Amino acid sequence: IHLIWAQDQNGGIGKDGKLPWNISEDLKNFKKLTLNSTILMGRHTWESLPIKPLPNRKNIVLSSQNMPEVESYSSVEECVEKLDAQGTSTLFVIGGSKVYRNFIHRADELHITFVDKNTVGIDTYFPVTLLKIKEEFEKISKVDLGKEAVYTHWIRK
């Protein structure tokens, strides 16, 4: 299980139900990493997508509400059980905060883009501090994505 997100200097990941920035190199990297994989998100993340479903990926939503337009599950346990039964080899959790909180302890790898901004109006934060991440994960690579962002890849220790 992989978690993938971008955050600002304070751990901010969302503003008004959307990404608070538009960094093309980060979006390209997200696409490259998640293409031809299964992606899992919460209902709010699903609703914020400009294109539904994200193309060339199996889209799954975790929601307590009925979601007839997309494969969805109402609990983490049901979701994990079904994906295991389907033989899903790689799962990318793409948001939001509640879904990250439910999967961080199950994650094998993290893909974090650090955005060099202190964004105004952030209302959603990644639910785990970088200090806690560093206790459980080891950074194995770092790539500059232009002037505004740095992509990092972490594996569980």
Locate predicted features.
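Enzymes that bind and transform nitrogen-containing heteroaromatic metabolites
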Residues: 1-157
